[in-house]
Amino acid sequence: MKFLFDLFPVILFFVAFKLFGIYPATAVAIGATVVQIAWVHFRHGKAEPMQWVSLAIIAVFGGATILLHNETFIKWKPTVLYWLFAVTLIGSVIGWRKNLIRAMMEKQVTLPEPMWGRLNVAWAGFFAVMGVLNLYVAYQFSTDTWVNFKLFGSMGLMLVFIVAQSIWLSRHIQETPSE
């Protein structure tokens, strides 16, 4: 359910684009992200830092798209977010010696120490490639194709990556002793 909730602004953007075009869809995405964070804040007392970052990026790039009537800005938004994720994953290890993937997953999965580093790099690489791929689709195809890719292509590639990662991890997961 959380996965669908996280996709709420993207799904509304997609529907609004199909019905009204890129500029109204961008306004809908900004509004949906604000509503999403307000709801999370209301339900849980605070929103996650990445939700705030996502709001800031959609507000800046979406706002520029609407104000300047130039769809290029909204097309850059996923790339900026993907690259920010990649830099954050690598930067947290280099700057603070903290593996964020491990911090998020270690309660669910027990892995040998070197595997956490590889997993972190794999996710950073995935996000870096997704940023490049988004720009490729944005500049080489129509806006309609880009919007379809933004929802279905990105989600499909993420699913393939997660399945491949799960298969790869299954060979390295360590059993935890039962009490």
Curated annotation (Swiss-Prot):
Keywords from the named record: Cell inner membrane, Cell membrane, Membrane, Transmembrane, Transmembrane helix
Parts of the chain that traverse the membrane: 3-23, 49-69, 76-96, 121-141, 149-169
Locations listed in the record: Cell inner membrane
GO cellular component terms, semicolon-separated: plasma membrane
InterPro entries the record matches: YciB
Any one Pfam family match given in the protein's UniProt record, by short name: IspA
Bilayer disposition of the protein: Multi-pass membrane protein
The keyword Transcription belongs to this UniProt entry's keyword annotation: no
NCBIfam families assigned: ispZ, PRK00259.1-3
Family statement: Belongs to the YciB family.
Described purpose of this protein according to its UniProt entry: Plays a role in cell envelope biogenesis, maintenance of cell envelope integrity and membrane homeostasis.
This protein's name: Inner membrane-spanning protein YciB
Gene from which this protein is expressed: yciB
